[in-house]
Design a protein with these regions (language model features):
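Sequence context surrounding c-type heme c attachment/ligation sites in exported
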Residues: 1-231
Length: 231
Protein backbone atom coordinates (compact mmCIF):
# COMPACT_ATOMS: atom_id res chain seq x y z
CA UNK A 1 0.00 0.00 0.00
CA UNK A 2 2.73 2.45 0.95
CA UNK A 3 4.59 1.67 -2.28
CA UNK A 4 1.66 3.02 -4.30
CA UNK A 5 1.33 6.03 -2.01
CA UNK A 6 5.03 6.86 -2.25
CA UNK A 7 4.94 6.52 -6.04
CA UNK A 8 2.17 9.12 -6.23
CA UNK A 9 4.03 11.48 -3.90
CA UNK A 10 7.16 11.09 -6.02
CA UNK A 11 5.18 11.85 -9.17
CA UNK A 12 5.96 8.40 -10.62
CA UNK A 13 2.68 7.46 -12.25
CA UNK A 14 4.24 4.45 -13.98
CA UNK A 15 5.04 2.88 -10.59
CA UNK A 16 1.56 3.17 -9.09
CA UNK A 17 -0.22 0.57 -11.23
CA UNK A 18 2.24 -2.29 -10.59
CA UNK A 19 2.10 -1.67 -6.83
CA UNK A 20 -1.70 -1.73 -6.81
CA UNK A 21 -1.87 -4.78 -9.08
CA UNK A 22 0.52 -6.68 -6.82
CA UNK A 23 -1.63 -5.89 -3.81
CA UNK A 24 -4.82 -6.91 -5.62
CA UNK A 25 -3.57 -10.46 -6.24
CA UNK A 26 -1.60 -11.13 -3.06
CA UNK A 27 -3.20 -14.15 -1.35
CA UNK A 28 -3.96 -14.05 2.37
CA UNK A 29 -1.49 -15.74 4.67
CA UNK A 30 -2.43 -19.06 6.23
CA UNK A 31 -2.89 -17.46 9.65
CA UNK A 32 -5.25 -14.70 8.44
CA UNK A 33 -8.35 -14.74 10.70
CA UNK A 34 -11.48 -15.82 8.84
CA UNK A 35 -13.40 -12.69 9.84
CA UNK A 36 -10.74 -10.56 8.16
CA UNK A 37 -11.23 -12.17 4.73
CA UNK A 38 -14.22 -10.05 3.58
CA UNK A 39 -12.27 -6.91 4.40
CA UNK A 40 -9.17 -8.22 2.66
CA UNK A 41 -11.27 -8.86 -0.42
CA UNK A 42 -12.57 -5.28 -0.26
CA UNK A 43 -9.03 -3.92 0.00
CA UNK A 44 -7.88 -6.05 -2.93
CA UNK A 45 -10.90 -5.07 -5.01
CA UNK A 46 -10.18 -1.39 -4.34
CA UNK A 47 -6.55 -1.89 -5.34
CA UNK A 48 -7.55 -3.74 -8.50
CA UNK A 49 -10.00 -1.03 -9.54
CA UNK A 50 -7.21 1.54 -9.43
CA UNK A 51 -4.50 -0.58 -10.99
CA UNK A 52 -4.54 1.18 -14.38
CA UNK A 53 -4.47 4.90 -13.52
CA UNK A 54 -4.34 7.29 -16.47
CA UNK A 55 -3.40 10.40 -14.50
CA UNK A 56 -1.63 11.18 -11.25
CA UNK A 57 -4.89 12.57 -9.91
CA UNK A 58 -6.66 9.27 -10.61
CA UNK A 59 -3.80 7.36 -9.01
CA UNK A 60 -4.01 9.54 -5.91
CA UNK A 61 -7.75 8.98 -5.68
CA UNK A 62 -7.20 5.21 -5.84
CA UNK A 63 -4.53 5.32 -3.14
CA UNK A 64 -6.73 7.43 -0.88
CA UNK A 65 -9.67 5.06 -1.43
CA UNK A 66 -7.38 2.17 -0.53
CA UNK A 67 -6.27 3.94 2.64
CA UNK A 68 -9.92 4.42 3.56
CA UNK A 69 -10.63 0.72 2.94
CA UNK A 70 -7.70 -0.19 5.18
CA UNK A 71 -9.08 2.06 7.90
CA UNK A 72 -12.53 0.50 7.61
CA UNK A 73 -11.00 -2.95 8.01
CA UNK A 74 -8.88 -1.94 10.99
CA UNK A 75 -11.84 -0.28 12.65
CA UNK A 76 -14.12 -3.27 12.13
CA UNK A 77 -11.60 -5.95 13.12
CA UNK A 78 -9.81 -3.86 15.74
CA UNK A 79 -6.54 -4.71 14.08
CA UNK A 80 -4.06 -2.65 12.12
CA UNK A 81 -1.16 -0.81 13.66
CA UNK A 82 -2.54 -0.81 17.17
CA UNK A 83 -1.43 2.20 19.15
CA UNK A 84 1.09 3.40 16.58
CA UNK A 85 -0.51 6.82 16.41
CA UNK A 86 -1.46 7.16 20.05
CA UNK A 87 1.75 9.05 20.68
CA UNK A 88 1.45 11.21 17.55
CA UNK A 89 3.26 14.44 18.24
CA UNK A 90 2.69 17.88 16.81
CA UNK A 91 5.00 19.04 14.04
CA UNK A 92 7.96 21.14 15.15
CA UNK A 93 10.21 23.05 12.77
CA UNK A 94 13.20 22.65 15.10
CA UNK A 95 16.08 24.62 13.56
CA UNK A 96 14.93 24.19 9.97
CA UNK A 97 13.89 27.06 7.72
CA UNK A 98 13.26 27.76 4.07
CA UNK A 99 12.79 24.85 1.68
CA UNK A 100 14.13 22.27 4.14
CA UNK A 101 11.48 23.25 6.67
CA UNK A 102 8.70 23.19 4.08
CA UNK A 103 9.65 19.73 2.83
CA UNK A 104 9.91 18.36 6.37
CA UNK A 105 6.50 19.81 7.17
CA UNK A 106 4.94 18.36 4.01
CA UNK A 107 6.43 14.94 4.72
CA UNK A 108 5.18 15.01 8.31
CA UNK A 109 1.69 16.04 7.18
CA UNK A 110 1.42 13.34 4.53
CA UNK A 111 2.51 10.62 6.94
CA UNK A 112 0.28 11.81 9.80
CA UNK A 113 -2.79 12.13 7.57
CA UNK A 114 -2.06 8.69 6.12
CA UNK A 115 -2.01 7.19 9.62
CA UNK A 116 -5.16 9.10 10.43
CA UNK A 117 -6.89 7.34 7.53
CA UNK A 118 -5.40 3.87 7.72
CA UNK A 119 -5.22 3.13 11.45
CA UNK A 120 -7.60 5.11 11.70
CA UNK A 121 -6.63 7.62 14.40
CA UNK A 122 -8.03 11.11 14.91
CA UNK A 123 -4.99 12.32 16.83
CA UNK A 124 -2.67 11.57 13.92
CA UNK A 125 -5.04 13.19 11.42
CA UNK A 126 -5.31 16.30 13.57
CA UNK A 127 -1.51 16.58 13.85
CA UNK A 128 -1.16 16.38 10.08
CA UNK A 129 -3.89 18.96 9.53
CA UNK A 130 -2.30 21.34 12.01
CA UNK A 131 1.07 21.12 10.27
CA UNK A 132 -0.51 21.93 6.91
CA UNK A 133 -2.70 24.79 8.06
CA UNK A 134 0.36 26.51 9.54
CA UNK A 135 2.57 26.33 6.44
CA UNK A 136 4.82 29.37 6.32
CA UNK A 137 4.02 31.56 3.35
CA UNK A 138 5.62 34.83 2.22
CA UNK A 139 4.32 37.63 4.42
CA UNK A 140 4.04 35.40 7.49
CA UNK A 141 7.79 34.94 7.93
CA UNK A 142 10.72 37.28 8.48
CA UNK A 143 13.75 37.62 6.20
CA UNK A 144 15.26 34.55 7.85
CA UNK A 145 12.19 32.41 7.21
CA UNK A 146 11.12 32.43 10.85
CA UNK A 147 7.38 32.73 11.65
CA UNK A 148 5.97 36.16 12.48
CA UNK A 149 2.74 34.76 13.96
CA UNK A 150 1.94 31.95 16.35
CA UNK A 151 0.71 28.67 14.91
CA UNK A 152 -3.03 28.00 14.88
CA UNK A 153 -4.24 24.93 16.73
CA UNK A 154 -6.76 22.63 15.06
CA UNK A 155 -10.21 24.09 15.62
CA UNK A 156 -12.18 20.88 15.82
CA UNK A 157 -15.36 22.94 15.69
CA UNK A 158 -15.80 23.96 12.06
CA UNK A 159 -15.13 27.63 12.84
CA UNK A 160 -12.75 28.02 9.89
CA UNK A 161 -14.95 26.39 7.28
CA UNK A 162 -15.47 28.68 4.30
CA UNK A 163 -13.63 31.54 6.01
CA UNK A 164 -10.53 33.11 4.50
CA UNK A 165 -7.45 32.70 6.67
CA UNK A 166 -7.28 36.14 8.35
CA UNK A 167 -3.53 35.95 8.75
CA UNK A 168 -2.71 35.70 5.08
CA UNK A 169 -1.43 38.96 3.59
CA UNK A 170 -2.36 40.05 0.09
CA UNK A 171 -1.18 37.52 -2.47
CA UNK A 172 2.05 38.27 -4.29
CA UNK A 173 1.85 38.57 -8.07
CA UNK A 174 4.67 38.16 -10.55
CA UNK A 175 5.31 41.42 -12.40
CA UNK A 176 8.11 40.00 -14.54
CA UNK A 177 9.05 36.57 -15.82
CA UNK A 178 11.98 36.05 -13.38
CA UNK A 179 9.50 36.40 -10.51
CA UNK A 180 7.05 33.83 -11.89
CA UNK A 181 8.49 30.92 -9.93
CA UNK A 182 8.27 32.96 -6.71
CA UNK A 183 4.62 33.78 -7.33
CA UNK A 184 3.87 30.17 -8.27
CA UNK A 185 5.47 28.95 -5.04
CA UNK A 186 3.53 31.55 -3.05
CA UNK A 187 0.27 30.35 -4.62
CA UNK A 188 1.11 26.68 -4.06
CA UNK A 189 1.90 27.26 -0.40
CA UNK A 190 -1.32 29.17 0.09
CA UNK A 191 -3.27 26.33 -1.50
CA UNK A 192 -1.62 23.80 0.80
CA UNK A 193 -2.35 25.98 3.81
CA UNK A 194 -6.00 26.13 2.72
CA UNK A 195 -5.96 22.36 2.25
CA UNK A 196 -4.80 22.07 5.84
CA UNK A 197 -7.87 24.04 6.85
CA UNK A 198 -10.04 21.56 4.95
CA UNK A 199 -8.26 18.67 6.64
CA UNK A 200 -8.96 20.31 9.99
CA UNK A 201 -12.66 20.54 9.13
CA UNK A 202 -13.00 17.03 7.68
CA UNK A 203 -15.38 15.01 9.81
CA UNK A 204 -16.15 11.96 7.67
CA UNK A 205 -13.84 9.37 6.18
CA UNK A 206 -15.04 10.41 2.72
CA UNK A 207 -13.98 14.02 3.33
CA UNK A 208 -10.62 12.87 4.68
CA UNK A 209 -10.13 10.60 1.70
CA UNK A 210 -10.67 13.50 -0.72
CA UNK A 211 -8.32 15.80 1.19
CA UNK A 212 -5.57 13.19 1.27
CA UNK A 213 -5.95 12.46 -2.44
CA UNK A 214 -5.61 16.16 -3.23
CA UNK A 215 -2.56 16.52 -1.01
CA UNK A 216 -0.56 13.70 -2.56
CA UNK A 217 -1.62 14.80 -6.04
CA UNK A 218 -0.12 18.22 -5.34
CA UNK A 219 3.03 16.62 -3.94
CA UNK A 220 3.45 14.41 -6.99
CA UNK A 221 2.72 17.17 -9.50
CA UNK A 222 5.30 19.44 -7.89
CA UNK A 223 8.00 16.76 -7.62
CA UNK A 224 7.45 15.71 -11.24
CA UNK A 225 7.51 19.33 -12.45
CA UNK A 226 10.84 20.13 -10.82
CA UNK A 227 12.36 16.75 -11.67
CA UNK A 228 12.97 15.79 -8.05
CA UNK A 229 13.88 12.11 -7.73
CA UNK A 230 12.58 10.68 -4.44
CA UNK A 231 13.38 7.06 -5.29
Amino acid sequence: VTAARDAVIAGRLEQVGPALRALSVTPPTTDTPVDWLPWLQEVQSTAGNGAVPQTLEAAAASVAALANACGDCHRATRSGQGGAAQGAERYTAEDRSGLAEKMARHQFSAEALWLGLTIPEHQAWSAGAEALLNIRVPGLVDVHGKPLVADRRPSGTGDLQGVRDPRLPAEAHAATEPQADVADLDAALRELRALGGRADQARTTGEKQRVFAELITRCGDCHAAVGLDLT
